[in-house]
Structure formats: C-alpha cells, structure tokens
A protein has these predicted regions:
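Short, positively charged patches
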Residues: 1-135
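Glycine-biased, small-residue-rich flexible motifs in mid-sequence functional cores and linkers
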Residues: 3, 78-389, 393-398
Length: 398
C-alpha cells in the first residue's frame, strides 16, 4: 500500500486506462522512481499537455483520495499488490489501480469467466444466462460482468441465487449510483464477490469509459461468454478484447438464426467461438486449457514486460513462452490427465444413475453397446444414446 499514492498520481495525471502510464513507469521498474522523474514535467518523452498535467497534479490530492476510500470502506489495489487479479496482469495496458468493494481474496482464489450481452435481451437469453451462470457458481467458478441492465444483471443474479462469487466491473466511480436500478445489488455482490473499477471516486459514466472498461472484464477471465448480441452491441467489444488477449470466446447459439438480435453471436460462432449448450462446455474448456495448467502469474517486472514492448500486446505469445520454459512434456501430460479427470468428475455430477454406469464402463476404453448392456443391465439401444460420453473423454486426451 506504500506506493499507492504514486500509482494514483499517474492515474490522476494521465487518466485511467492511458497506456502512456506504462511507457513512463516501466523503464524505471519502480513507480516511486518514475514519479520522481516525471512529476515536475521534465521527462523527455512528455508532450506539452502531459507536462502541464504533471505539474498541476499534486501528490497531496492522492493522499486525500486514499483517505476518502478508507472512510468509505473501499480498497485500493495497485498493479504491485498481491491481490491484483493475476490474469489481468497479462494483458496489454492493464489498469494501474483498481478501486474495490468486497472480497477480492475470494475472487482471485478461483477461475473466472466473463458473461456479457445486450441490455434488452429476449426472455430466452435472460433465462439461459441466469441458468448457466448459476451452474458455474455452484462449481466454484467466478462470473465477471459489467453490472449493466439486461444480461449483465442476469449473470450477476444467477450467481447471487447460488451464494456464489461474482465480480461487477464498473465504468464509473464506486460511489456513483449507476445504474440506479442495481444499487442494492452492489452490497449483495460484495459479500462473496467484488465490485471493481479503475475510475476515481466521483467519476460519472461516459461512453468512452465503457469501451475502456471492457478490456478489464475479459482480462480478468480465462474466457468470455456472449449470450445475445447484435452486430452493433457493445458486448462484442468485450469479446474482441478477449480474442486479442488470447482468451477463449464462448457463445450461446441463437434461439432464432433469422433474428437480428443474435447477428453478432452468429458472426463469432462462424469465426470459431466455442458454442455453449450448457455450463459443462465452459467447464470442459477450462479444465483442458492452458489456464488450468499454468494459472500462476506472479508480479515480476522483467518477465511481465519485454524491453521493447510495454506491456504485452499478444498474451497468446506469452502463454507459449511460459509453457515452454516452465512445463516439461512429462509434466504437461500429467496436468492434462488431471484436468481431464476433473472435467470428467464435473460431467458425472450432472448424469443420471444409468449414465454414470455407462461412463464407468467407458472410462478405460471403448466397448460395443451389447457389452455395455451386459455389464450394466441397461437396454443396448439406451446404452447407445449414452456413448457420446466417451467422445468427451477421448477429446480431452488429445
């Protein structure tokens, strides 16, 4: 917390979400040294506007904000903080400072998936969003969304019904009542989850705030689920960030392929997004992914930012680099096996007794339907309908 005032100074002087903050801080590898070099406006790379902002922003203003947050019960988490969301460090232009209300420790202790969509959804999309997010919450997956009306609210609601962990990422200050219809939900979310923003207290929502904010929603998660969006939906900005960050994009197949409300989803499905028919599709993707294998991203300046790139512009490259240096082939095989087993166990949770019997028969290899019927006392025609379970397991082994 000792460096919080200097991180805050950069945010106040150059505004939240400005990548110039990193261009000034990274060369020093220390935010205090960067502040000492920049605050008088003498840094060589600064333009006239930046110099004026630097000399008119005073460190005492930062101390006042810290005191205000303490009085309101808000936490200030900087990029250096151990409670900074790990995956968020691994994106281009991560937020230098997060203002939080709630239980960040609980959030960072589990995997997270983002869920976004339109503010004016169909009944179909609202129901399926709430259902899937609730099922993920029951399985200790955190759900991140943007706290807007419509499908964002449905995502949060589904998690809250299960007393799960959800994160609401705001496009305004924590103390700003927006949207006013969701004010009570803030306190409910903060019990097991967290309300987050990179914007200073008192900041009103503006159009550009939402666009800048969306990179945080996707950046905190291993994947982003889009449940309903037309071609102009703002939720597609979040999906685009997810793709650029090397994260998985999930989409709910449209309830009506001719309905223009789903045109944005259809585009992403055509481009290779993972179709989601239930929460199991998301769980399977996580437990067989690189994030399950290597989800420990610690705070290390040299590894996090290359000498010629501030910060990462392609997290997919980063993942490959980390895997090649940290995971040996034998270890990777063992981790994949472990992830497959966990995905298999989650599948069992949602099976009937007969399906579990068939799954047990298929776990060690393929069997003819007649052999399954003989071993389980299940009709062979019924057994055939269950043999798709082996396909899930085989795919995970590849």
């Amino acid at each position: 917390m000792s460096n919080a005032r200097y991180w805050l100074w950069f945010v106040m002087a150059f505004r939240p979400g400005n990548e110039r903050i990193w261009e000034m801080v990274i060369p020093f590898q220390d935010v205090k040294k960067a502040y000492d070099a920049v605050h008088e406006g003498n840094h060589a790379s600064m333009n006239a506007k930046e110099k004026k902002s630097a000399v008119t922003t005073h460190i005492e203003q930062c101390d006042s904000i810290i005191k205000y947050c303490e009085d309101k019960g808000y936490r200030i988490i900087t990029f250096e903080d151990e409670n900074y969301p790990p995956l968020l460090r691994n994106i281009y232009n991560p937020p230098a400072v997060l203002f939080c209300m709630g239980n960040m420790e609980n959030f960072i202790s589990r995997p997270a998936v983002a869920c976004v969509g339109t503010r004016k959804p169909s009944v179909y999309s609202a129901e399926i969003t709430e259902k899937i997010c609730g099922e993920l919450a029951k399985r200790e997956i955190a759900v991140v969304s943007g706290f807007a009306l419509g499908l964002d609210s449905a995502a949060h609601k589904g998690v809250l019904k299960q007393n799960g962990c959800t994160a609401a990422v705001l496009a305004c200050g924590l103390d700003v009542n927006y949207p006013k219809e969701n004010e009570k939900a803030k306190k409910m979310i903060a019990v097991n989850g967290v309300v987050i923003t990179e914007y200073l207290p008192g900041t009103r929502p503006d159009r550009w705030c939402f666009h800048v904010r969306n990179r945080i929603i996707s950046g905190m998660c291993f994947g982003t689920l889009v449940t309903e969006a037309d071609e102009k939906s703002g939720s597609l900005i979040t999906a685009a960030h997810a793709a650029e960050q090397g994260r998985t994009v999930f989409c709910i197949p449209p309830g009506d392929i001719f309905d223009k409300r789903y045109s944005g989803v259809i585009k992403y499905l055509r481009d290779g997004a993972v179709p989601v028919f239930s929460h199991l599709d998301i769980l399977y993707e996580y437990y067989t992914s690189d994030y399950f294998r290597n989800n420990d991203i610690s705070m290390k300046w040299p590894e996090l930012y290359g000498e010629n790139d501030i910060p990462y512009r392609d997290s997919r490259t980063v993942k490959r680099k980390n895997q090649s240096s940290r995971i040996k082939p034998q270890e990777e095989q063992e981790i994949t096996k472990q992830g497959t087993q966990m995905a298999y166990e989650h599948l069992l949770d949602d099976m009937t007794d007969e399906q579990r019997l068939v799954a047990a028969c298929l776990k060690d290899g393929d069997l003819h339907s007649d052999e399954i019927a003989l071993a389980t006392d299940i009709d062979s025609f019924q057994a055939v309908s269950y043999t798709h379970l082996r396909a899930h397991e085989t795919e995970a082994d590849l």
